[in-house]
């Protein structure tokens, strides 16, 4: 009986360790990318869309227009699959920085299999700076502030307007905490 109990306990620890290896984030519908989709260890992971300043706003430079980003937490090596939503030439994909702990494999259907060895940040660039995918493979969060603390201004998953008139005011000793999946519209003004 001791042997069976010990085996069951070890199996439970191994299973929970396996489940905790990756935490995927969601992205609200209005921010989802039209360029890319991603999975991490088989789980759907949100991909958000963003823009750089591009013509006609700044006619002197072309900064590349729309890009996308995806983020997740990992505490063990992870397999990330990314796929462009529209047909794209994926034959010259670069991972930058080149020193990122990522192994790239291009699949016949145009999907990319990225073996990420440890938490890091990198970009997937099929054709230079045009419509890249930024990947934020974060370590698990530590020292999370208590959202019930009156000195903590916390925003949970979803879309939020930051404070009055879109401005978040922070005073001396206050902490701003954005949980995974929080999208806050507005600016931050810190005093103290």
Kindly label every feature range from the protein language model.
Residues 4-5, 191:
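Small/flexible residues
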Residues 5-19:
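Hydrophobic h-region of N-terminal signal peptides that target proteins for export
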